[in-house]
């Protein structure tokens, strides 16, 4: 979504605590020097690159010693709930995920008090803390009026096919990075079928060595899953004239025409230009 004209996207995240790979590990596998970029420069990159990743350990250092303990537990804790609420970059609109539908309304009410203009809180029916690729997702929609509307959406509402959770399961950070790089570099070669053999990806974005994408991976499922999240964010930001399917087309176009790749290159170059030694 960061490659779409008029969009400025700030993702706040860290390392995995309950899954094989978090967004932080994925991006570091693609060469982003997250542990070497001062927090104030991470915020600046939003304006230089139209997108940024706010690496939680660089903003909330007091919580760093807890990371190994959280990872060893293997289930969500209070800190999984707290994370999105302490995003260091204040925004007027946003997409937030919770791992339990019981948290949806509470989360929505809390975020409303923080002064957001318009946002969604989502929970996949299976307990995903994002929109489900497989079926219904619960949505709590809140605007400045303070009214909370609760409804469900499915991939079909976005004009996308459904995919099982098994088809979009996470690999290692390096494998996930290879999938993302392949989608950005070769969007025209993505096929809706499991890979018959491991796929090696040459990543000229960062000149890093990535693990091959495992045989059996359905890249079209991963692609649709990614587009689903981006389309929701575009809708929340006011794109697509209030049409979810049009937002899907916008997200797909930004990948197909290279704008998403260009945004990634800008972010990579900026972070390397400001990293500390």
Where do the model's predicted regions map?
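Active-site cofactor/substrate anionic-group-binding motifs, chiefly glycine-
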Residues: 1-13, 17
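Active-site-proximal loop->helix
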Residues: 16-33
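Conserved catalytic-core motifs characterized by acidic clusters
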Residues: 12-18, 87, 127
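Glycine-rich anion-binding loops and their surrounding alpha/beta cores
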Residues: 6, 28-36, 41-277
């Amino acid at each position: 979504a960061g490659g779409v004209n008029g969009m400025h996207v700030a993702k706040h995240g860290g390392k995995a605590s309950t899954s094989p790979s978090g967004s932080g590990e994925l991006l570091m596998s693609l060469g982003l020097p997250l542990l070497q970029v001062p927090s104030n420069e991470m915020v600046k990159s939003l304006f230089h690159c139209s997108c940024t990743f706010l690496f939680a350990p660089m903003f909330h250092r007091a919580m760093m010693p807890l990371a190994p303990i959280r990872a060893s537990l293997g289930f969500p804790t209070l800190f999984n709930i707290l994370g999105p609420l302490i995003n260091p970059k204040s925004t007027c609109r946003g997409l937030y995920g919770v791992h339990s539908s019981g948290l949806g309304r509470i989360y929505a009410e809390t975020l409303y008090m923080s002064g957001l203009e318009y946002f969604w809180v989502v929970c996949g029916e299976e307990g995903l803390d994002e929109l489900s690729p497989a079926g219904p997702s619960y949505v709590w929609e809140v605007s400045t009026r303070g009214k909370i509307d609760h409804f469900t959406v499915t991939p079909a509402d976005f004009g996308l096919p459904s995919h099982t959770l098994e088809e979009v399961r996470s690999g290692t950070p390096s494998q996930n990075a290879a999938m993302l790089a392949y989608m950005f570099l070769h969007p025209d070669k993505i096929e809706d079928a499991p890979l018959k053999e491991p796929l090696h990806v040459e990543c000229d974005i960062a000149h890093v060595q990535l693990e091959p994408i495992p045989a059996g991976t359905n890249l079209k499922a991963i692609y649709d899953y990614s587009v689903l999240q981006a389309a929701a964010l575009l809708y929340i930001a006011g794109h697509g004239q209030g049409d979810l399917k049009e937002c899907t087309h916008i997200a797909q176009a930004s990948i197909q025409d290279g704008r998403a790749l260009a945004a990634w290159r800008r972010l990579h170059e900026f972070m390397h230009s400001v990293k500390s030694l």
